[in-house]
Amino acid sequence: MANEIITPTEGELKTIIDKTAAYAAKLGESFENKVKQREGHNAKFNFMKEGDQYYPYYRNKIVENKAKIQADAAAAAAAANPKTPSTTTTTTTTTTATTPLPTATATTTSPTPTTSSTIVPVPQTNSTQQLQQQQQQQQQTTPVFEKPQPPPPPPPKKEPTQPDPLLYILDVPDFMTPLELDTIRLTAQFIAKNGDSFFMELASREVKNSQFDFLKPTNHLYEWFRALVESYAQIIYPPQGIKEQLKSNYFSNKQTILERAMNRCEYNQLKEIEEQKKEEREDEEKTIIASIDWHDFVIVDTIEFNEDDLDDLPQPRTFDQLIAGDTPFGGSDFDNDGHGSNGKGGQDMEMEMDMEMEMDDEDNNNNEDEIEESSLSSTNTTGNLPPKDQSKLKIVKDYQKSNSSVKSNAPTKLTQLCQFCKQEIPLDEMQEHMRIELIQKQQRDSRLGGGGSSNNNNNLTNTLTQDDDIARNLQSFASKRVDIFGETESSKKQDEQPTQAPKVIWDGHSGSIPRVQAAQQAAQLAAQQAAQQKAAAIAAQQASQQQASQQQQQQLQPPQPIGIHHHPQRHLPPGMMPPGMMPPGMMPPGMMPPGMVPPPPFGMIPPGMVPPPPPGLMIPTAPPGLMIPPTQQQQLPPQTNTSPSSSSSIKVEEPQSKKLKIDDVLIPESVWLQNNPNPVNLTVEMADKSNIYQITLQPTDSISLLKEKIKELNGMPTNKQKLQAPGLSILKDTCSIAFYNLKSLAIVTCGQKKKGGKKK
């Protein structure tokens, strides 16, 4: 059944099989491979695949067509070269066929009967020769059907090599319009002919023209444009010997040109196949990655932990122990003796380890008797340890444990940095150290260069300190000797930098959670108190500075006597006026004499009148025996000097008093809560005086809760409310009632925020 040939029915499929077999027999396996690559996905060409039902029929048709081609070739060759002996043989065969055979058989086979009884016998020799010739002629004329030989194996397929680059053929981008193509081609021709100078001029002149954007290196058509320029340049200015190269066999032989074209085609196809396979591999990888269930898992092994396994382990160390460097020794020996990791067992082990280290240092100085005594004492003191550890322990008598944490009371020596060895040397040893360093330097220089006069001079110049080193040394010396040079700016900055509070870190144990929380709360409270104290100190300093400036101003303007409106010019001789003053009769209408102030309009405070001074300011009193008029008691002393400097000083001082902030002098929130723990009844007054509300809150409640209460009463959104208390700035939502020191019956004004306006 495997070799059974199934003939397809008459139709399109049979026609395709017959034509394909005919071409395959004529062109060989290369044609079959190309058809398989090109029509591999076509179902009509499945007969070319092994295992198909029509594959044996297809192979048989190929064999038949090859045999037919060979027979036609042999016949054509015979017709081209005719032979004369073949014609003679055919004539002899026809004549011999008509001659009768000898003996009686000849009489019986004769076509015409004879009447005579006598027959002329034919010679035997001639008849045998004719029979042999007839047999030879029949053998020559009868066609011999030989079994067709299989075709020779095709030559090994040649791998395609990388072809030469195409210098004069460029692929035109698909997205390019005909106008852009013509513009780029014409520009490339001119640039290839005229050079880069023309390119630079054209690019600078047409920089704003959108049609010449391809001249910019950032454009997507710039690379294609440069390749086009290079191609045109090679055509306009061809290389030397190009004509002889074109006349060579490499370009004139058609077979060579065809092979080169086939190589380029196969190379391009191979590249496309590789790119396609690469894309398929990438798609497969993406598909595999997308199909992975990242939440899936497989149990490899199960490890069971029993409570008995934890008995031999030491107790977990806390964060403080890790920082302190304590290493608890937990083991079965100490547990059996009843010593914990932090108990006596750990101390004994630590002492024994220190003894062993000390003994190793003094091993060369001890005698054998001392070693024996120490070994005996070690066996007596360490009876609880295993025997294998007793032989290693060495105890020194009169041992004193060195404590690195205890600082020596000896006074610290002053040191100085050596410029040669870069080490801190005591001042009393500095001279000897420098002498040794200089000697060593001279010896080293003499070994290297063999010392001469020039070398000595160089050594002397090298030992001198440079200017920048001198300045640096003096600066460091001044920073260390504050008692001589005073405090420098760097030391002040270091002192002003606040010390960073230790970070509160949880060690992971559940038992230390309350301690960590308490430490964190204490740190936050301390930071808040420090900030409030700093703000209060700054506010107090500002208030004291302002009070001092106001007192200084009042001292510069002492109160005048009763005749405050009278000027010193009254002591001049009669009939004389001070310079720049006109007589009263010659004053223009509406003007008052000097020293006289016109009365202010009704309802306005005179210019000299000011509100009562703030608390803490002292109003200067008149000298003994003088009385200030009642209208001048709440009036600051007038300024007799009318120069611009005096007026400008008053204008500078007024905004400073207006911008005085009271938020900085508030009592800390924690202190306020301790003194006022009761609920607070606030009076909320609308800015337009329309409504007044009474709201009761706790001192710890925030301002945002107060806004919610106001929203419930009048419906105003919380983000539109602007709350302000007397003497305070706008109340912030995140702060509490106690933060602003609001007591009961305090008045809070509720206004509406305005967007887009200038801040006042």
From Swiss-Prot:
Gene3D superfamilies: Phosphatidylinositol 3-kinase Catalytic Subunit, Chain A, domain 1, Surp module
GO MF annotations, alphabetized: RNA binding
PANTHER family (alphabetical): SPLICEOSOME ASSOCIATED PROTEIN 114/SWAP SPLICING FACTOR-RELATED (PTHR15316), SPLICING FACTOR 3A SUBUNIT 1 (PTHR15316:SF1)
Residue spans of biased composition, Basic and acidic residues class: 487-496
Subunit-structure text: Component of splicing factor SF3A which associates with the splicing factor SF3B and a 12S RNA unit to form the mature 17S U2 small nuclear ribonucleoprotein complex (17S U2 snRNP). Identified in the spliceosome 'E' complex, a precursor of the spliceosome 'A' complex. Identified in the spliceosome 'A' and 'B' complexes. Identified in the spliceosome 'C' complex.
Entry superkingdom: Eukaryota
Domain Ubiquitin-like as annotated: residue spans: 680-757
Source organism of this protein record: Dictyostelium discoideum
Function: Involved in pre-mRNA splicing as a component of the splicing factor SF3A complex that contributes to the assembly of the 17S U2 snRNP, and the subsequent assembly of the spliceosome.
InterPro entries xrefs: SF3A1 (IPR045146), SF3A1_dom (IPR022030), SF3As1_ubi (IPR035563), Surp (IPR000061), SWAP/Surp_sf (IPR035967), Ubiquitin-like_dom (IPR000626), Ubiquitin-like_domsf (IPR029071)
Pfam families with a match to the protein in the record: PRP21_like_P, Surp, ubiquitin
Residue ranges of the region described as Required and sufficient for nuclear import: 655-677
GO terms of biological process kind: mRNA cis splicing, via spliceosome; mRNA splicing, via spliceosome
Protein name, per record: Probable splicing factor 3A subunit 1
SURP motif repeat positions: 16-58, 183-225
Name of the gene encoding the protein in the UniProt record: sf3a1
Classification via CDD domains: Ubl_SF3a120
One cellular component (GO) term of this entry: spliceosomal complex
Record field: compositional bias (Low complexity): 77-147, 374-385, 454-464, 544-557, 629-649
Annotated region (Disordered), positions in chain: 77-165, 309-348, 360-393, 442-464, 487-509, 544-583, 624-657
Compartmental location: Nucleus
Coiled-coil parts of chain: 259-290
Biased composition, class Acidic residues, residue ranges: 360-373
Family classification: Belongs to the SF3A1 family.
UniProtKB keywords: Coiled coil, mRNA processing, mRNA splicing, Nucleus, Repeat, Spliceosome
